[in-house]
Amino acid sequence: MTTFYTVVSWLVILGYWVLIAGVTLRILMKRRAVPSAMAWLLIIYILPLVGIIAYLSVGELHLGKRRAERARAMWPSTAKWLNDLKACKHIFAQENSSVASSLFKLCERRQGIAGVKGNQLQLLTDSDDVMQALIRDIQLARHNIEMVFYIWQPGGMADQVAESLMAAARRGIHCRLMLDSAGSVAFFRSPWAAMMRNAGIEVVEALKVNLMRVFLRRMDLRQHRKMVMIDNYIAYTGSMNMVDPRFFKQDAGVGQWVDLMARMEGPVATAMGIVYSCDWEIETGKRILPPSPDVNIMPFEQASGHTIHTIASGPGFPEDLIHQALLTATYAAREYLIMTTPYFVPSDDLLHAICTAAQRGVDVSIILPRKNDSLLVGWASRAFFSELLAAGVKIYQFEGGLLHTKSVLVDGELSLVGTVNLDMRSLWLNFEITLVIDDTGFGADLAAVQDDYISRSRLLDARLWVKRPLWQRITERLFYFFSPLL
């Protein structure tokens, strides 16, 4: 019996080390950033069982077998649709400004289509204005409405949007609603999901959270887009979830969330529509390719129209494109660069690009919320401040609530707005969307919004920052080490 237990013990020990060696080899064989690989290896060696379980759960990008098969199957038809769209030459911009040229070329070569022109674009910074505009557009819809949000939180004006959407479905408008399972858990636990389905709305719970399948798909891979398309002509996107800030996370101690949304009319709605159709097919298996733009109903040739490129990320979409776009935009800056984000945990490449811009004379400003709803990200962000300040970057800490706007403005002409945070999760993992706008008029509008944020912020003093307590420095470095995993 003693011999039996001895053999079993040695087999367990051998299996234990084989498992660690196997996971180590898997990490080393994956083409990932060195800091990320080192962080995972350290966790596995310090807390082997916890580290191995964590890595197998969230260490690699698993979309799930069924969704991955759908993603592969949809691309032939999607590629054909994009190729057919190129025949609509009147919607594509032939030239771009000098500051935007490189970025638009990158997007065209990676995604297969050029930026689209002739769009009307409006910035909305007040949640009530967003909701009211959306309700009006829903009430005037004639054919179809598609929506996707990370969070839909019942309460306040979000309920009025829900009522208007159900009314549209009852009068024959084809309505589709896709919501992230984790972000919209309150919605799916409320009566609203059943009420909408009973009204005729197709409601899809995207990327369902299921602990039984934790090793088959990454549970932290989320549908983070916020998009609305109406009649293939009107579109919305930006940082705002379908929530009323007066009711959302009031106990978090960070104040009301401050967001920005863009309302558009024109062919950009078609470009966003193909992104939605891909998401819908990956999640449901149903193909809903949007129609090509109709020149008879869309004012493409208006002189005041904006040129917009749509960048989508996530499994099944061009890998690393949003990260490349941010790097390209940063290196294109010659005069000034302003960034706003609630979560700042940049890649080494992006951090160096930002610092280099400041060191070559560009006026670089980053606006972050002073109080953050994520303790981990809040501390990790602070670990980058010293390097940024030393390079000459101005860091503004917003004090008017949780600044949730994601925006980049380069030289007053090139703008990026959308759902992408400047953190690892948005850059490498989630389903995200960003608009790239080449227009001085829109740049002036965005600059006014960012100036308002700065007026409600406190400029971080580099001299005081270096005098912060030792315990804060230690905490920052601890979270900085794990920043590649956040």
UniProtKB/Swiss-Prot annotation:
GO terms for biological process: cardiolipin biosynthetic process. It catalyses: 2 a 1,2-diacyl-sn-glycero-3-phospho-(1'-sn-glycerol) = a cardiolipin + glycerol. Residues 219-246, 399-426 form the PLD phosphodiesterase domain. Its main location: membrane. The keyword Transmembrane applies. CDD domains: PLDc_EcCLS_like_1, PLDc_EcCLS_like_2. SMART domains: PLDc. Keywords: Cell inner membrane, Cell membrane, Lipid biosynthesis, Lipid metabolism, Membrane, Phospholipid biosynthesis, Phospholipid metabolism, Repeat, Transferase, Transmembrane, Transmembrane helix. InterPro entries: Cardiolipin_synthase, CL_synthase_A, CLS_N, PLD-like_dom, PLipase_D/transphosphatidylase. It is a multi-pass membrane protein. One of its GO terms (cellular component) is plasma membrane. It is an enzyme of class 2 (transferase). One of its GO terms (molecular function) is cardiolipin synthase activity. Pfam families: PLDc_2, PLDc_N. It comes from the Bacteria. Its EC number is 2.7.8.-. It is found in: Cell inner membrane. The chain crosses the membrane at residues 3-23, 38-58. The active site is at H224, K226, D231, H404, K406, D411. Catalyzes the reversible phosphatidyl group transfer from one phosphatidylglycerol molecule to another to form cardiolipin (CL) (diphosphatidylglycerol) and glycerol. Belongs to the phospholipase D family. Cardiolipin synthase subfamily. ClsA sub-subfamily. This is Cardiolipin synthase A. The gene is clsA.
